[in-house]
């Protein structure tokens, strides 16, 4: 039983970006393609050992190599995306990104045959059978295991901010859910998801991992799918909240924000600051507001006593941390509203086309 280790947390500030995409046909609709792209054909060099399928054969995941600094993230992300788009096009597929694909109907799509996913389908049943979600996961290296747990605890309040900004999944199984991120609700139906409780230290977190595996609740620690978690194999804190994004600039904005948060919180930990100890129920309320209202959300502030418009929180965070990307994301049309506008004004073909991940060689 591999539970990772305290020793894995041995570096600070490194980055890793994992993206889940939809494999689509010539009309931009999800189609089974991961067998061809992952198993049957050798991927380009940048994707070797960094390409995998997900639960459905229409969902594929990429991972960047470990990135040494934020300044190198742009090139690393571009290299992986370029390779994926080229690989897909070579074999007659396209690539699209969103939290949920508006044309995906889960009953009409094929599940992967990988034993791990088949075991999940058997154990979890309906919630996993319909899980056509795609997200963005960001890893930031932390050089101490107890620090990583403390940072993950504190990051919980910031997760609804990221979710509200990233929300671009209003449609699920062929209808408008009325939500901005239906992905968040679909995924939250699985066990071991959503907003985690706080852990006292790494020992308590690892004890929890061990209990979940040894009692058969999960097959491996990777099935703890919380919105944020210490990753005891990679030695990182992993943020798993954002919807998948077609625009690489939006991805980089969330990477910039996540790294800045981890650096800020790490410094606070080293200064001996006490944790906020937020109630999970109130953090869940913020998450609900984020997935329901997106850019129009009003979230409970850090004191959990007052509602503040998302725009004010974003501006405050940009000034506090010296970041700018999330301001650009907020000031742009939200992904969910863009999808609704396109479907109403131009139809499903235009909407599907807008989710295409493309590569401009210039």
UniProtKB/Swiss-Prot annotation:
Enzyme class: ligase
GO biological process: modified amino acid biosynthetic process
Keyword Manganese appears in the UniProt entry: no
Catalytic activity annotation: L-cysteine + L-glutamate + ATP = gamma-L-glutamyl-L-cysteine + ADP + phosphate + H(+)
Stretches assigned to coiled coil: none
EC number: 6.3.2.2
GO molecular function, one term: ATP binding
Key words of the record: ATP-binding, Ligase, Nucleotide-binding
Family: Belongs to the glutamate--cysteine ligase type 2 family. YbdK subfamily.
Job of this protein: Catalyzes the synthesis of gamma-glutamylcysteine (gamma-GC), the main low-molecular-weight thiol compound instead of glutathione in halophilic archaea.
Protein name per UniProt: Glutamate--cysteine ligase
Organism: Natronomonas pharaonis (strain ATCC 35678 / DSM 2160 / CIP 103997 / JCM 8858 / NBRC 14720 / NCIMB 2260 / Gabara)
Lineage of the species this protein comes from: Archaea, Methanobacteriati, Methanobacteriota, Stenosarchaea group, Halobacteria
């Amino acid at each position: 039983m591999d539970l990772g280790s305290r020793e894995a947390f041995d570096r600070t500030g490194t980055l890793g970006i994992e993206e889940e995409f939809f494999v689509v046909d010539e009309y931009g609709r999800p189609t089974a393609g991961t067998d061809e792209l992952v198993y049957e054909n050798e991927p380009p060099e940048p994707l070797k050992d960094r390409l995998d399928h997900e639960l459905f054969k229409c969902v594929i995941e990429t991972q960047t190599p470990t990135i040494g600094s934020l300044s190198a993230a742009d090139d690393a992300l571009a290299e992986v995306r370029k390779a994926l788009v080229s690989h897909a096009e070579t074999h007659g597929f396209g690539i699209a990104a969103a939290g949920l694909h508006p044309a995906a109907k889960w009953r009409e799509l094929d599940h992967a045959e990988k034993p791990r996913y088949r075991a999940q389908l058997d154990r979890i049943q309906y919630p996993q059978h319909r899980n056509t979600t795609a997200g963005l996961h960001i890893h930031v290296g932390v050089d101490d295991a107890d620090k990583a747990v403390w940072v993950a605890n504190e990051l919980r309040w910031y997760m609804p901010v990221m979710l509200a900004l990233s929300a671009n999944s209003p449609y699920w199984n062929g209808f408008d859910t009325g939500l901005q991120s239906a992905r968040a609700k679909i995924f939250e139906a699985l066990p071991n998801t959503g907003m985690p409780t706080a852990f006292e230290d790494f020992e308590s977190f690892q004890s929890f991992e061990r209990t979940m595996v040894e009692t058969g609740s999960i097959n491996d620690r990777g099935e703890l799918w919380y919105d944020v978690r210490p990753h005891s194999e990679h030695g990182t804190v992993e943020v798993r909240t954002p919807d998948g994004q077609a625009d690489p600039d939006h991805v980089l904005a969330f990477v910039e924000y996540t790294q800045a948060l981890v650096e800020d919180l790490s410094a606070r930990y080293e200064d001996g600051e006490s944790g906020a100890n937020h109630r999970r129920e109130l953090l869940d309320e913020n998450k609900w507001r984020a997935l329901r209202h997106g850019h129009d959300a009003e979230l409970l502030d850090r004191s959990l006593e007052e509602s503040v418009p998302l725009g004010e929180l974003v501006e405050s965070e940009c000034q506090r941390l010296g970041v700018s990307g999330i301001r650009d994301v907020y000031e742009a049309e939200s992904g969910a509203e863009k999808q609704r506008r396109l479907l109403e004004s131009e139809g499903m073909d235009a909407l599907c086309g807008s989710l295409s991940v493309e590569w401009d060689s210039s």
